[in-house]
Each structure stands twice: as structure tokens, then as C-alpha cells.
Amino acid sequence: MKKLVIILIALLSFGAIADAQVSVTKKTKIERLISLRGGYVSMSRHNDLIYLSVWSDNRFDEAYIINLGRDKATAMQSLEALIEIADTIKKDESIDFNDGLHEYYVYRGLLKGEIWIKANDRAGYGITSKGELKKILDHLTFEVY
């Protein structure tokens, strides 16, 4: 219940700033917003593609966007692949990716279970863990318009 209240407060306080961030993706509708240590993650859809968007704790930084695919099943596979890849990375190492829109990398932190997904070409970043990525997967099971 406490987590739900925190998420709701984050959603309400993020509203006006989220509108400004949305302009980065040309009026992308934000479907889910999850507060993470050091950042915020949202699921969104634009031009028939599903994206994972991440902002740093400084919510005035630009969001960066990871293209997850055209449908829910593909998006879930993309996130599962990120989790599996992160599991193979040694601590304090990273793997670079390019989704056709942006370059980003998945980095294994020094803390147990810590995974960073960070863009190479944008200011924003997200800090998450395997468990929190699974929460994003769970949220994605809701309909994304």
C-alpha cells in the first residue's frame, strides 16, 4: 500500500514535467511510470512502436528511449532479453546496444542485483535491478494503446 501511495504521489507530481518530456517523443502517451532508485521509467507507444523511456532523478533532463518492438509480446521479449543479458555481465562491466534510434548500454553495478540502463547520447539515465525490471514487465501486461 505504501509503494502504491508513493507511485501515485510521483505520478501526480510528475504530471506537468512529464508533458514537457513527452514532446521529446512527439506526444507519446505515457502508460506506466515506475519510480526507481535514481530515476523514473515509463512504458509508452508512438507510431506503432512500444518504448521504454528513462529519466534521471533530475526530471528536467531529457528522457532517452529504448525501442522495444511493435507489440506487447515483442516488448516483453525485449525486456526479458535485457534481464538475461544483464545476468551475464560481470560486475563493473557493460554491453553496448543500438536499437536503431539511440545507442545505450546495460551496465552491471557493484551492488548485488544492480543493473543500469544508460544512454550514450542523452543526459537521462535509470538505475534499476532485475526485480524492478520484472515489475516493468508485469506492468506491460496491461493494454498499451
Regions found by a protein language model. Name each.
Residues 4-14:
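Sec-dependent N-terminal signal peptides
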Residues 18-145:
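Positively charged, low-complexity terminal tracts
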